[in-house]
């Protein structure tokens, strides 16, 4: 986690059997365990469930799950040990890796969430063009790009040696430690040191800490690029998705007098999107507000508040598989099968695409469906054509022609799988 203060988190006199330490251990262990199990289940569900494995959206869900899984295994575990012991146990080299992996996994997780929102919007906005637009190659290129960007903002600063301190800077740090006036160095955008924290009596064995001080300018740039811009795009995508869902729902309801159970689909979509955006903001916004403040003066924010914001960000990796998994009926079925250790019963559908769309509309009142849909092709004389091609018509009391694209969009939205399909 990018943070401007870790050197005075705990000292060598920490009581390892205090209620506070026990609480930290229990809560941290639960977050790590749920993160690992949940994200492993997501990956297994996608690769073992035929319906999920054939979807282009799987790449983005797997990217999110892998980022959260790596964050739990490589970052949270060692962060918890560091918090419990009060000092760094794993050496200077791994400290570099740990800090960089922290930034990379968090950035990749946020970017993946943003890409998922864009992908889902495209699915509903242009369902007929989606398969042609979102090819496997394009999906993999998007995933590769977001991971490369995440790597750049995390590891490159170390490779450029922005973190190295001169001997004069090291002497200044130790002088400040002795005088209890530790200040953040402004000489570099980054400053890293594996320092020796003195105990209360100043004579005890020094305890190393893994530190990562952040300059204010970098903190602002990182927060803007890796959180505020992706967050704005995600909110924009989900707002447009909600408006499309509302528009299509009202149109189909007015034309076909939907079954009463379909009357709740709009509220289900709104509830799902509210949970997604609300959870994301609740977990990440506090840290990205406090982090620039910490870079200016590490004493402005109480230590306890700062640590809470760090673990709130970690907690997002715990709830992601719950939200993005259980909001989809296919994932729920796959989770139940995996938890019960049941085998997959794969079936091959022989139903044509148009017939599948028609069958998906079985919730329309039967009396309005006098027969199967017919295709009206562009012969240059059809007054209902829009840009050529064919449209699928469903006989209704009002004889309204509904395009196949609109039908497919409503099929997606009617299943309440607003996030992933």
Swiss-Prot record:
Domain of life: Eukaryota
Transmembrane segments: 22-42, 60-79, 96-118, 139-160, 214-234, 275-295, 305-325
A biological-process GO annotation: positive regulation of MAPK cascade
GO molecular function annotations of the record: G protein-coupled receptor activity
Expression (tissue specificity): Central nervous system.
Glycan attachment points: 11
Family: Belongs to the G-protein coupled receptor 1 family.
Full protein name: 5-hydroxytryptamine receptor 2
Source organism of the structure: Aplysia californica (California sea hare)
Lineage: Eukaryota, Metazoa, Spiralia, Lophotrochozoa, Mollusca
Gene that encodes it: 5HTB2
């Amino acid at each position: 986690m990018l943070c401007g203060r870790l050197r005075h988190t705990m000292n060598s006199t920490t009581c390892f059997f205090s209620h506070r330490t026990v609480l930290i251990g229990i809560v941290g262990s639960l977050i790590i365990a749920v993160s690992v199990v949940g994200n492993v289940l997501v990956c297994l569900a996608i690769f073992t469930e035929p319906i999920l494995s054939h979807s282009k959206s799987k790449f983005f869900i797997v990217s999110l799950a892998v980022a959260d899984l790596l964050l739990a295994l490589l970052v949270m575990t060692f962060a918890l040990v560091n918090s419990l012991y009060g000092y760094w146990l794993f050496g200077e080299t791994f400290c570099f890796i740990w800090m960089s992996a922290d930034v990379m996994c968090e950035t990749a997780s946020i970017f993946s969430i943003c890409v998922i929102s864009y992908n889902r919007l495209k699915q509903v906005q242009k369902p007929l063009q989606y398969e042609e637009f979102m090819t496997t190659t394009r999906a993999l290129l998007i995933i590769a790009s977001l991971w490369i960007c995440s790597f750049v903002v995390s590891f490159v600063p170390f490779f450029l040696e922005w973190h190295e301190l001169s001997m004069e800077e090291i002497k200044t740090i130790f002088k400040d430690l002795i005088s209890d006036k530790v200040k953040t160095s402004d000489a570099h955008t980054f400053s890293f040191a594996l320092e020796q924290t003195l105990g209360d009596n100043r004579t005890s064995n020094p305890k190393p800490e893994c530190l990562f001080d952040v300059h204010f300018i970098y903190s602002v740039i990182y927060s803007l690029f890796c959180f505020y811009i992706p967050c704005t795009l995600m909110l924009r995508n989900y707002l447009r998705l909600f408006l499309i869902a509302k528009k299509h729902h009202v149109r189909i309801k007015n034309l076909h007098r939907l079954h009463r159970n379909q009357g709740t689909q709009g509220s289900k979509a709104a509830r799902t999107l509210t949970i997604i955006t609300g959870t994301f903001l609740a977990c990440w916004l506090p840290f990205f507000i406090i982090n620039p403040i910490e870079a200016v003066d590490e004493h402005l924010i109480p230590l306890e508040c700062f640590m809470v914001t760090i673990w709130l960000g970690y907690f997002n990796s715990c709830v992601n598989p719950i939200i993005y998994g259980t909001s989809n009926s296919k994932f729920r079925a796959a989770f139940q099968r995996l938890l019960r250790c049941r085998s997959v019963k794969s079936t091959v559908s022989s139903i044509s695409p148009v017939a599948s769309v028609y069958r998906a509309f079985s919730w329309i009142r039967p009396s309005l469906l006098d027969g199967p849909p017919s295709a009206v092709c562009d012969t240059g004389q059809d007054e209902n054509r829009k840009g050529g091609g064919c449209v699928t018509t469903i006989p209704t009391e009002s004889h309204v022609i509904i395009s196949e694209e609109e039908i497919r969009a409503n099929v997606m939205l009617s299943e309440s799988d607003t996030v992933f399909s």
